Amino acid sequence: MRTWFHAVAIDYDGTLTLGRRPTDAVLAAMADARGAGLRIVLVTGRILSELRRDFPDVDAHVDAIVAENGGVVTHKGGGVRRAAPPLPSALADLLEASGVQLRRGMVLLATTMEYDAAVLAAVRRLGLECQLVQNRGELMVLPANTSKATGLEEALSDLGVSPHNCIGIGDAENDHSLLDACEVGVAVRNAIPALRTRADIVLEQENGAGIIEVLRDVVRGTVNAEPKRWQVELGTFDDGSPARIPASQRSILVQGASGAGKSYVAGLFAEGLLDLEYTICVLDLEGDHPALGERRGVVTVGGVDGLVPPEHVVRLIRHRLASVVVDLSLEPFETRKAYARTLLAELLERRADTGLPHWIIVDEAHVPLGPEFDAQCLVPRPQGLCLVTYRPEILCPTAATGHDIELDVRSPDVVILTRPGEPPRRFHPNRRDTVHVRHWHKYTAVPTAMALRFVFRGPGGPNGRTAGHLAEFDAELRAASDSVV
């Protein structure tokens, strides 16, 4: 799917249906979406056996079920497992002895809000750490730190989908965590006011009709939202307000003169993405981004270790959910260009299936994406693509135009942010978390011309030892005698 979203997590009661079973129209829309490659996860506070009693063929219509408000997870293999430890049986026994009408799940205890005081008193009496969660007129008693968000995380992990590639849809009090955990949170029209206020999108339709609306838009690739919780702060505007840009569903062009600070700004954006747990792949043609490899969850390949096959990079991202910096700086120019083109095409192809990496950052983009580049892989414009260049005029037309955001780096302290339909705004970049050294390997490992080499001298003059770059200089210095030093 050439769309950012690869999964939709849907609440059941009040969202997918108001009755015991979704309508035929809703089930048909779900089947069409799954046929287009979208995974559907049903996320409910219901006890699993009760859900299957009212909707016996539920497993045939979804890719996974999160039941008991995150406490139980199923998957397509037919397995059912607890995603949290069950509550002590002593609590259920005490509640039933107190006259509370109770239903026992694999993890949670379910009752109604009329018994909330009795439940709270029993929890206090036993000294338990648990939580009480309201769902309209229902009351659930759950282990601490168990929610629809925690259960969804496990279900998506089983499916190989990141929460950043998921839309969450709900209607009630226990859906707040579901919406917050997903890239975009959606409230159906009949949702409670608090959830409507918190949602990124509020649908025009209620429950099942709203679900049909969302699934249609996801398959078409027309979902458009900019959640404030998923933004990268790059600096400060002249008026003192933070300069933020969306962390997903956009394409970005970073341009500016050589030495102005383009790679610094691109690295600043990459750090922000990593802080928000997006998966990125940086094609580093000049060795500007080795410090990103020091971040947790980031792997560096290439450089002094030599290149790995492009499919190896794809596997690192797919199976380890790792971000990768591909250091091409020590390779010949034509090798860098050819490798970057091959890897970019392969990453985009695999991302259509998995959603990963969320972002591809191509530094020195004019090298692989010059005027002769066959730009079919860039049609339609990929979301999550950041091109960095000091020569935008020689980018192929498809790569040069149509970006959602442009960052014109005028100097290390001045960047102009431009978005379609908005006036350009100047901001001053933040400090980086990692050290930025421009063209690192060019100075540390690429040999200089003979006339520019370091020459070592002893008491009697030159001793025949030279160094063509900083790595050689360091080695020679360590081996030199005191008289040379």
Go through the PLM ranges and name each one.
Residues 221, 229, 404-484:
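Phosphate-binding and hydrolysis-coupling loops of NTP-dependent motor/remodeling domains
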Residues 12, 285, 363-365:
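Walker B catalytic acidic pair
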Residues 228-359, 368-404, 454-485:
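P-loop NTPase catalytic phosphate-binding loop
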Residues 21-105:
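Active-site phosphate-binding/coordination module
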Residues 2-4, 23, 149-229:
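Mg2+-dependent phosphoryl-transfer enzymes with acidic/Ser/Thr/Gly-rich catalytic loops
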